[in-house]
Amino acid sequence: MVDTPSILFNEQFTQRNVTQKLRDYPASIVHLATHGQFSSDAEKTFLLAWDGQINVRTLDQVLKERITLNPLELLVLSACQTAQGDEQAILGLAGIAIRSGAHSTLGTLWTINDRSTAEWMVRFYQNLAAGQEKAEALRNAQLSFLQSPEYAHPYYWAPFILVGQWH
């Protein structure tokens, strides 16, 4: 399930490059580690790129374009509160991604720590590479943090939520 990566760092992580990669690169998993904001008002919902904001409508359009040719198996939104919604849209950016055609989205329920999240993601991806289903990989990454003295507090392991298909 783990693809050969195509990576956009810093100034390469532009609105144009991100949307082009999402359209053209046949990855089954896309990992976006950035900052974002969610609101039930689409104009106030976005992910941050190097050169500005990737509006939720753009993300929605790009994901819908992939549905027939190359549907996205897993979209990882490694940013604060990507699965936290409001009274009008309860699943936040993660829910929008599912409605737009991603089979599954991994999001967060609250503000996350960059260092611990990077370590958590390594464990999650190691679990996927070992052949675990998405939900199992999530659970086992959480359990490994729960058993770690440094990251046993729920702040570090509990914000991650899988929305959509769990297998």
What positions do the PLM features span?
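Catalytic cores of enzymes
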Residues: 1-167
